[in-house]
Amino acid sequence: DISEKMQKMLFEMMNFYHARRCGVIEFHNSTSNLNNLSFLWYDLSYENMQRNVTPISGKVKNLQLSILSPVMTDIIDNDGIVVYRSSEMKTLEQRSPVLYDHLKNKLNVSNMIYAGLYGCNNNLIGIVFLEYNDFFKYPEDIIDLHDIKERASGISQLLEFKSMI
């Protein structure tokens, strides 16, 4: 079952990197991903979180993809992965007040790692993320961004397989 495999991958990733939450954001057009059309919406399709963390997947459904524009740009400009520390959130607020409000006020997020999920035609089809309260507990020297990108590649393959069934 694809959902079980995805949850297992997210659980392992979340625990390995000591994150409070790990999730997969999928881009879509209404009810399905239509080939060769620009994506308009996104959902938090899969989510795994630590025991004391409240799920947010119910708050992240059918949102306009334009909200994630800065994240998508940063992912593309940074070889498929981007880290936002709480100290950089002010810069994000200047670039995209809507995204800042969504992350900070609606979801209460302060530190994130986003990695791009790519389809077989190398288009961005989604994002996998790790969420942290405090990066200082987990310095970047133990967070292997290359490994996160490798794991994202496995998640991409699972999403591609799901879209074919």
Language-model regions, residue ranges each:
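Short, solvent-exposed, Trp/other aromatic-anchored flexible loops in extracytoplasmic proteins
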Residues: 107-110, 129
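Well-ordered, non-membrane alpha-helical segments in soluble/globular domains
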Residues: 3-9, 68-69, 145-151
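A short, aliphatic-rich beta-strand micro-motif
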Residues: 110-119
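Intrinsically disordered, low-complexity terminal regulatory regions
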Residues: 1-52
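Regulatory sensory and allosteric helical modules in signal-transduction proteins
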Residues: 43-105
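Short glycine-/small-residue motifs
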Residues: 114, 124-127
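Juxtadomain coupling helices with adjacent low-complexity linkers
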Residues: 126-165
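Residue-level signal for short segments within beta-strands and strand-turn junctions
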Residues: 26-28, 119, 132
